[in-house]
Amino acid sequence: MKLVHPLFSNFLHSKPYLIVILTTAATALILIPIPLVGDIGFEFALLMALIATGGTGFITIYLVFQWRFYQETKVNFLSLVCFLLPLSLSILILPLTFILVKSGFSGFCNFYDGLAFFVLLPCVTTLCSAAVALLCSLLAHNKLRATILFITIILGSIGTSIYRLLIHPPLFAYNPFFGYFPGPIYDEIIVITPTLLIARGL
């Protein structure tokens, strides 16, 4: 008896999943030499959240349509959702590993805050993005329409936050996808506030 259904085990070797894994890993490697973002902290977490948004949506839509149209899967919806949660988070394993190794050699600066930002921003973002992509996949009739709907929602959400920041520069922005941005003018040291915890918890 197989512990993992072929639908799931095959997906872990599929091209879409490997592309997303390599993209997030490559992004982390590109960011590492760059000052400010090349250490585990808010800036690195923010950029990884943006990358993870698209990556998670891409693999979620692909997997859901595999599930919908592969009639012999016999996988119920709950099993699909339970697989999606760790799957979404798995795309962040290599970026986190790379930045921890780099930060370990260069000397950790605010390690616990940086790790907390990584959990609160990209990790929570992947779960939110997976949920939205799942909904889009269930509502749309094909991958293209699901992808267009997903991108429209993401751009609409992020665009609204950017518009608010442009109109009111001193303001900060909370967003389900990129997480949090303290505004164009912010202190060098960004701390985790109860408001951020509540916003990401919701």
Describe each PLM feature range.
Residues 58-65, 130-134, 160, 202:
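Alpha-helical transmembrane segments
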Residues 32-48, 54, 82-143:
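Secretory targeting signals
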Residues 61-70, 99, 103:
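Transmembrane alpha-helix boundary signature
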Residues 1-67:
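Hydrophobic alpha-helical transmembrane segments
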Residues 34-45, 94-117, 155, 159-199:
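Membrane-interfacial interhelical loops
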